[in-house]
């Protein structure tokens, strides 16, 4: 927990293959952190793990199952994120505060989606008729449908 919290000089990290969990607030307010290389086998990204970091792209491994509350809160440089299909839980405010985020793509139905996972200005790309679609309708998020495959 808080391993590199507020380490303002940190710009890039290559996480070792044995890392299966990123603890709460591990890279909290690492304002210059632009690049993170996540290992396959990573299961959970903790609460506020990358709060207020500067990543422009986010490539999560397919092994990720849990995005905890505010994991990428105020990551203002992200513009588009496509979530891996094995994510079971997307906790509240995961990508909220990312003012440049335009699209969050969710191509599957997670077991749980928390409130306010994105800002109102962003949209969620999903399949029509999915649980994610229903979540968007109930929460008032703009939806962009993925063409059937």
Where are these regions (language model features)?
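Structural signature of tandem-repeat unit edges
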Residues: 7-21, 31-44, 53-66, 76-89, ...
């Amino acid at each position: 927990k808080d391993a590199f919290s507020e380490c303002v000089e940190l710009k890039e990290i290559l996480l070792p293959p044995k890392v299966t969990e990123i603890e709460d607030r591990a890279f909290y307010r690492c304002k210059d952190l632009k690049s993170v290389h996540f290992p396959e086998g990573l299961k959970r990204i903790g609460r506020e793990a990358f709060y207020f970091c500067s990543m422009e792209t986010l490539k999560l491994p397919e092994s990720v199952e849990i995005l905890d509350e505010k994991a990428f809160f105020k990551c203002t440089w992200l513009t588009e994120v496509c979530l891996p299909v094995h994510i079971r839980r997307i906790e509240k405010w995961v990508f909220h505060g990312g003012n440049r985020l335009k699209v969050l793509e969710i191509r599957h139905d997670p077991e749980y989606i928390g409130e306010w996972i994105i800002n109102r200005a962003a949209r969620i790309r999903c399949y029509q008729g999915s649980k994610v679609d229903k979540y968007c309708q109930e929460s008032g998020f703009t939806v962009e449908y993925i063409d059937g495959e």
